[in-house]
Amino acid sequence: MAEMGSKGVTAGKIASNVQKKLTRAQEKVLQKLGKADETKDEQFEQCVQNFNKQLTEGTRLQKDLRTYLASVKAMHEASKKLNECLQEVYEPDWPGRDEANKIAENNDLLWMDYHQKLVDQALLTMDTYLGQFPDIKSRIAKRGRKLVDYDSARHHYESLQTAKKKDEAKIAKPVSLLEKAAPQWCQGKLQAHLVAQTNLLRNQAEEELIKAQKVFEEMNVDLQEELPSLWNSRVGFYVNTFQSIAGLEENFHKEMSKLNQNLNDVLVGLEKQHGSNTFTVKAQPSDNAPAKGNKSPSPPDGSPAATPEIRVNHEPEPAGGATPGATLPKSPSQLRKGPPVPPPPKHTPSKEVKQEQILSLFEDTFVPEISVTTPSQFEAPGPFSEQASLLDLDFDPLPPVTSPVKAPTPSGQSIPWDLWEPTESPAGSLPSGEPSAAEGTFAVSWPSQTAEPGPAQPAEASEVAGGTQPAAGAQEPGETAASEAASSSLPAVVVETFPATVNGTVEGGSGAGRLDLPPGFMFKVQAQHDYTATDTDELQLKAGDVVLVIPFQNPEEQDEGWLMGVKESDWNQHKELEKCRGVFPENFTERVP
């Protein structure tokens, strides 16, 4: 009998729970469809949001703290193995062995104590703090279910209240029918029964509403008191937790520093006793690292190789005979650092010249370019005086001259280098720093470099019977004699002087060939790489574009490594210098004739 009773109770509870779930599901559907209103508490909803945020932060802190403790334990194991290795390599006869072993033991105990205190003062406190969240979370969920029950009971009671008149009409209608079928004495009892049944349903709905409201309000009041206090308690918990961790870590590092200092003292004593056996680590040069002196900048990929040049120190040298490491750069501009944009800067040789003279040697087949440089720019081997006039001859192949003026010397014959003979210069005609004729050098006398350059020569060179006409200034008697002596052994020399440019301004010369060029035109360059302009005053260049270089209006505005110019295509199309000109990096271009 007892078993039958327990089964009946269990079945009744199951049926009651199923009925509650169906009622709640029906109420939620009606609320979502908008056919039933929902009770809302914005203040409580804000407390629930804070609770969820606090739970998320606490869970993350607990996870990170466990990770920190795992790292401490791993560090403890690594330190323990390192100390064991030290004990193994420490010889028994070495001084301080006992102290080293004691330090290793204290180190191990210190790590264990640190880990245990972190667990007790941080991790366990964290677990206790988070232990209260599951219960509150379940109560919040239960409060939500009770709120649905309360809304359902309220809606049921309200529906009975609104349907009261309809029920009375339904009751009165059958009475009118019963009056015809039932006896007179039964009609009153039937009507009383229907009224009693309606009142019973209404009373039951009211009781359910009061009960649901009471349960909901009790849970709601408790949660509204606990949630704000729990939210405010997070500040004190965070402070205590991180203060404990910081204090434990500080004490740990203090004690660890003392142990490390003691170990260092033991090792210093060992080093003093065995000082003669000190092991010194020396840096070994890398086999792959090139020597600093042999490192030379290379042009960007795709740029043409540098043309072999002949360095002339009053003595002709073959193009392939240059010794490594002794190549003289044309100008210090090779060390110029280009704009910091890819491709890598191209070291374009440039030279600042006072005069340009082209000597047509070997009858228009090979024309050397003679440039006068200052002694500070020339680094020639051999003893030279600081006051001596030096020559830097760069022989670059140029197109043949159409109408050269030749001196009255044997013409039409090419004289090889091995047929040139040294010329003895008169005593005192050359400065003391220049090589003498006895050394087998090719002696040529030139005007002093300290003299100011004279006016530019006309385009047609004059013929001089004894040699070439000097570019500027007058020659001293000794220099004239040296020039005559040198010219007697020189082959046919063709002199053609081009107009000199001072700060980009052409002085002298015929301007018939430059009518279509912009004012102040200096020379042409061709872009070797694409360049994307980064400012409004810069030119946009593509590989192969030809740029006409012009001087800056204000020389002080010129930056190192930059030139002012206008693209040839833009100039030919618009002829407007102000709109078309701009600056561009010199190392992205190459000078063209």
From Swiss-Prot:
UniProt-listed PANTHER family: AMPHIPHYSIN (PTHR46514), MYC BOX-DEPENDENT-INTERACTING PROTEIN 1 (PTHR46514:SF4)
All copies of domain SH3, residue ranges: 520-593
Boundaries of every BAR domain copy: 29-276
Residues carrying N-acetylalanine: A2
Tissue distribution: Ubiquitous. Highest expression in the brain and muscle. Expressed in oligodendrocytes. Isoform IIA is expressed only in the brain, where it is detected in the gray matter, but not in the white matter. Isoform BIN1 is widely expressed with highest expression in skeletal muscle.
Effect of substituting D151N: In CNM2; results in severely decreased membrane tubulation
Residues modified to Phosphoserine: S296, S298, S303, S331
Key words of the record: Acetylation, Cell membrane, Coiled coil, Cytoplasm, Developmental protein, Differentiation, Disease variant, Endocytosis, Endosome, Host-virus interaction, Membrane, Nucleus, Phosphoprotein, SH3 domain
An annotated GO BP: negative regulation of potassium ion transmembrane transport
Involvement in disease: Myopathy, centronuclear, 2: A congenital muscle disorder characterized by progressive muscular weakness and wasting involving mainly limb girdle, trunk, and neck muscles. It may also affect distal muscles. Weakness may be present during childhood or adolescence or may not become evident until the third decade of life. Ptosis is a frequent clinical feature.
PROSITE patterns registered for this protein in UniProt: BAR, SH3
Coiled-coil ranges from the UniProt annotation: 15-42, 193-267
Region (Disordered): 280-354, 400-488
Name used for this protein in its record: Myc box-dependent-interacting protein 1
Gene: BIN1
Segments for region (Interaction with BIN2): 2-122
A Pfam family matched in the record: BAR
Quaternary structure and interacting proteins, as annotated: Heterodimer with AMPH. Binds SH3GLB1. Interacts (via SH3 domain) with DNM1. Interacts with SYNJ1. Interacts (via SH3 domain) with DNM2. Isoform IIA interacts with CLTC. Isoform IIB does not interact with CLTC. Isoform IIC1 does not interact with CLTC. Isoform IIC2 does not interact with CLTC. Interacts with AP2A2. Interacts with AP2B1. Interacts with MYC (via N-terminal transactivation domain); the interaction requires the integrity of the conserved MYC box regions 1 and 2. Interacts with BIN2. Interacts with SNX4. Interacts (via BAR domain) with BACE1. Binds (via BAR domain) F-actin.
Phosphothreonine: modified positions: T307, T323
Molecular function via GO: actin filament binding; aspartic-type endopeptidase inhibitor activity; clathrin binding; GTPase binding; identical protein binding; lipid binding; phospholipid binding; protease binding
PTM summary: Phosphorylated by protein kinase C.
Clathrin-binding: annotated span: 378-421
A GO cellular component annotation in the UniProt record: endosome
Keyword Cell division: no
Species of provenance: Homo sapiens (Human)
